[in-house]
């Protein structure tokens, strides 16, 4: 039985690291088909989710009350999952340079709780090269595991438009990628199970990262023209 089949059968779990306006809708979408561990460092936010309150207002209280996501602020629960999705923020420093502290912190937490054979997929908006040159080395160092041997990686940029109740995560085409061709196909297969709008498998992680940068740039240019 493949890992994909094990995820669908409930034998293996998926984790979502970062339950904000990006992570929460993804967690809820996957929880309809796969057992999901939803992790966030903010214990107060976790308690709100457990009580049926959606502080992000992205999916609504009714959906939160019904979802089967296993909400937790305990990082050791990540050991239960084999497929991890990182959806933490990527803010900007005062000098307008990217602040990679959140993604590096998430990488460190995953490294401390990574089991052999796991796949780590980043969704956070980053410039080309961050996944493989910044995040993966942290996971590798902390876990003591070898990249593309003991664990694998992918990148699938978040494309959610916050507050848009019509174009939800399932209805926005997803770009996917993997650290090897085989892992890329697997990551694409996992996302295809919930993204009804379809997916596009990029040839490499860096290409997927660049696609997000280009999309954001195009959006800024279009807004500038309208203004």
List the predicted regions and their residue ranges.
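Structural/interface elements that position substrates and couple domains in central-metabolism enzymes
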Residues: 1-227
């Amino acid at each position: 039985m493949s890992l994909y089949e094990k995820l669908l059968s409930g034998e293996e779990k998926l984790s979502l690291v970062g339950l904000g306006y990006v992570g929460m809708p993804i967690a809820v979408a996957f929880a309809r088909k796969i057992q999901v561990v939803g992790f966030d460092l903010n214990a107060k936010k976790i308690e709100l989710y457990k009580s049926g309150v959606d502080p992000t207002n992205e999916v609504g209280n009714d959906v939160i009350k019904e979802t089967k996501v296993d909400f937790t602020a305990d990082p050791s629960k990540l050991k239960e999952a084999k497929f991890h999705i990182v959806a933490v923020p990527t803010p900007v420093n005062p000098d307008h340079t990217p602040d990679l502290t959140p993604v590096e912190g998430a990488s460190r937490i995953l490294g401390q709780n990574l089991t052999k054979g796991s796949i780590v997929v980043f969704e956070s908006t980053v410039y080309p090269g961050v996944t493989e040159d910044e995040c993966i080395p942290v996971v590798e160092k902390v876990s003591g595991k070898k990249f593309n041997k003991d664990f694998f990686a992918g990148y699938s940029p978040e494309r959610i438009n916050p507050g848009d109740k019509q174009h939800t995560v399932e209805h926005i085409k997803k770009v996917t990628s993997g650290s090897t061709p085989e892992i890329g196909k697997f990551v694409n297969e996992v996302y295809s199970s919930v993204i009804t709008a379809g997916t596009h498998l990029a040839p490499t992680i860096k290409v997927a990262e660049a696609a997000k940068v280009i999309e954001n740039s195009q959006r800024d240019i279009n807004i500038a023209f309208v203004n």
